[in-house]
Amino acid sequence: MRSLIRSGALNAFLAASLATGQVLTWDEAYTKATSDLSLLSQEEKVGIVTGVTWQGGPCVGNTYEPTSIPYPSLCLQDGPLSVRFANPVTVFPAGINAGATWDRELIRARGVAMGAESRGLGVHVQLGPVAGALGKIPSAGRNWEGFSNDPYLAGIAMAEAIQGMQSSGVQACAKHYLLNEQEYNRDTISSNADDRTIHELYLWPFYDAVKANVASVMCSYNKINGTWACEHDALLNGLLKGELGFKGHVLSDWNAQHSTVQSANTGLDMTMPGSDFSTPPGSIYWGDNLAAAIADGSVPQERLDDMVTRILAAWYLVGQDQGHPPVAFSSWDGGAASVNVTTPEHGELARTIARDSIVLLKNTNGSLPLAKPASLAVIGSDAIVNPDGANACADRGCNKGTLAQGWGSGTAEFPYLVAPLDAIEEKLAGAGTAIITSTTDDATSGAEAAAAAETAIVFITSDSGEGYITVEGHEGDRNNLDPWHNGNLLVQAVARTNTPTIVVLHSVGPVTLETILAEPNVVAVVWAGLPGQESGHALTDVLFGDYAPSGKLPFTIGKSEEDYGADWTTSQVDDFAEGLFIDYRHFDQYGIEPRYEFGFGLSYTSFNYSTLSTSISTTPGPTTGETIVGGPSDLFAPIGTVSAYVANTGHVAGAEVVQLYIGYPDSAPSIPPKQLRGFDKLHLVPGESGIATFELTRRDISYWDVGLQKWVVASGTFEVFVGASSRDIRLTGSFTV
């Protein structure tokens, strides 16, 4: 089993990814930007902050090009997993899969590779990564674009992705800021959350993004406590630019701007796409209207100068003044690029991430890995590429064939798509295995195929996406958490032929599995998420035992939809009544037994935990440091470490994600029983031991005090939980502050 083996080329790429860094500091970038500012005319300044209208340039967003300085029309392009519309590009696994790897190195490398392809195509601002939707609602349409509904895991992934992307010379854009937690009514709903919930959940990963020097942040469509996100003074000026010390620029989501003067004065720096989507272009809030507002004093000149300085500084920060390539594609004519930015290493990286994100949920009596059986039934439409073509549905707005992306603006055009059946046939070529197929979702046909086989693999799906596309009655958000296309009935029909049945689930997030798990002949269940272009290869790597599965769930799978405590609403208001208690925090707080808990994932080997060591030293009380990029300077001060020994006690090589959870003392008011505050992925051969080390900061043991308006370390005894998941705790300890 080759759990630890990667090609020399990929290892070299990973090593180089970790060695990359920022081109300039913010101070250096601001010095250059300030020098340029004095050379610009008022018209040029307004052009830099205003989009040139929808489809007014080759990219989904474009700005006006000044002539007084050597600065281009900026190209802003989706997205969070590849370069939208362009081809050829590498279609990486979705953010939710990257999160399921729990692997900092792979998430950083994914960012480096995506950034390199974006830069090679001339993109200046890559619209990703995603921390909003965070994922409080398990059925929300765009959760899959982000990494996890846990803010700590999401924050670590955001930082790694941003550092990777920007090291390749492209500006990252952290989105969607803030509380954009559902698609239904996303452009009218008011997300009403209290200050503490905002800080400890939804703002948390944006702290990490800003600390990682993210160049830009996208404000969202929704209102927050009654005020539009893109004209929210407390949100943009108070929190983002004030408390977090953000130095980059804030750009609107496409048509999320609602005013000229108010949006300018409350912190918006760039409007996208500059007009609405009508043809010819309709309302334009900035451009001439912004110039007029400055002329009559409604918007101070200093505010425009600040907008321009922030945008120019972000451009300098990542070295885009140093030979950045011209835009090499058009979003509006099929996207054929004049250069090929894909590489073999990027393809191998996509396969590695997809493979390492696979979560083994059930494995009765070692049913996996599969030997090469005499006969194998492969069942379900998810086993093959969409018969109309992998890219047949615009923005992947259908669920036909194998599911490897969700739908919406966060998608890309497949250069190729390896379907599971293709990879299985490739894997078993020459093995003498008879492969019997039923590549529809018809239960009768599936049962007939299974009855003729020694083992059956059933492929099922659950899809979602952005609300401007409706797929099979789902308006972005999922209507429920059931498998699509009568997946429960298909699995039942197959399993009731008494054939050992393996279920492979391609989904955007949690799916209710109780009907499937009630079938005694369902011997294994695998969650493969949205694995991108190398889907089939990654899956067969695990199914046939070339690699041990090492993914862990970045969300909880409950036994029913009611278990989660949050759902999307048809109302114009969401009061976020669940507060801090989402996902595993909710399950823990209310004593609900999940089907598969947050952080869960089986392996083909076993691991033993021992020798917990805790060395923490700090003082209780609030933060007192000055604001730097990322927040108060002492918030990220190291306070010590927790460590544990982990040994591979099985017979094959494997990787274990060792997880640290912290429980707060009673002096911390109304707080979840435990919260993720560290993870370390150890790759171990049989008999090998390693040390999982978790370095803690003050933030990791702080809560937000609404009265003080500061992060506070509570006094008392903190509980330490180290384990293989949020419920599988192997070691416990404590420390006192």
Curated annotation (Swiss-Prot):
Compartment annotation: Secreted
Broad class of enzyme this protein falls into: hydrolase
Reactions it catalyzes: Hydrolysis of terminal, non-reducing beta-D-glucosyl residues with release of beta-D-glucose
Record's keyword terms, sorted: Carbohydrate metabolism, Cellulose degradation, Glycoprotein, Glycosidase, Hydrolase, Polysaccharide degradation, Secreted, Signal
Main subcellular localisation: secreted
Pathway stated in the Swiss-Prot or TrEMBL entry: Glycan metabolism; cellulose degradation
Protein name: Probable beta-glucosidase L
Gene: bglL
